[in-house]
UniProtKB/Swiss-Prot annotation:
Keywords: Coiled coil, Membrane, Mitochondrion, Transmembrane, Transmembrane helix. It is found in: Mitochondrion membrane. Cytochrome c oxidase subunit which plays a role in assembly of respiratory supercomplexes. GO terms for cellular component: mitochondrial membrane. The chain crosses the membrane at residues 35-57, 70-87. This is Respiratory supercomplex factor 1, mitochondrial. It is a multi-pass membrane protein. The keyword Transferase does not apply. Residues 106-139 form a coiled coil. The gene is rcf1. Residues 118-175 are annotated as: Disordered. Residues 125-142 have a biased composition (Basic and acidic residues). Residues 7-98 form the HIG1 domain.
Length: 175
């Protein structure tokens, strides 16, 4: 093969498997639902305030901080529920898009695999022809005048596209 680009291999890693990295996903989620991190921060601040008041021995402040923690957690839960209701249709569309994207990538990978198999088959045929030619030369026999390897069954019939199509014809009895 004179092509300088290597053939795609079925053993290659799928480099486009992840569309967005973790940092991009985190920033997207923070932009979509900014109230959830706010609720988490408020809960953490209430817990820090409660632990400081426990160390100081202020029971009234400790009780207020624990109540603030409960309110902050309730706020966080409400933000989560409201955000999930608001972004539900967007998530469904995103999942549908990712499904279509995965399907097209699987088709492309399958087509690349078939092209690779066909190219390997052609290379094997070339190697077989060269080996037969060397064998004939070594034995001193002349080469046959007309060697047809991929001739159609009838003159009016055109050869099919590739190995997989020919094999499917054999399997399903359409030869």
């Amino acid at each position: 093969m004179s092509n300088s680009t290597p053939l795609p291999s079925s053993f290659d890693g799928d480099t486009d498997f992840y569309e967005e990295n973790r940092w991009q996903k985190l920033t997207r989620r923070l932009k979509e639902e900014p109230l959830i991190p706010l609720g988490c921060i408020l809960t953490s601040l209430a817990l820090v305030g409660a632990s400081r008041s426990i160390r100081a021995g202020d029971h009234n402040r400790t009780q207020r901080m624990f109540r603030a923690r409960i309110y902050a957690q309730g706020f966080t839960l409400l933000a989560m529920v409201a955000g999930s209701m608001y972004w539900d249709s967007d998530r469904k569309k995103r999942k549908e898009f990712e499904g279509v994207l995965a399907e097209t990538k699987a088709k492309e990978k399958n087509e690349a695999w078939i092209r690779e198999l066909e190219a390997r088959d052609e290379e094997e045929k070339e190697m077989r022809r060269a080996r037969d030619e060397r064998r004939r030369r070594a034995e001193g026999r002349p080469a046959p005048k007309a060697v047809v390897t991929d001739a159609p069954a009838e003159e009016g019939e055109k050869p099919k596209g590739g190995v997989m199509e020919q094999m499917s014809g054999l399997v399903w009895g359409k030869k």
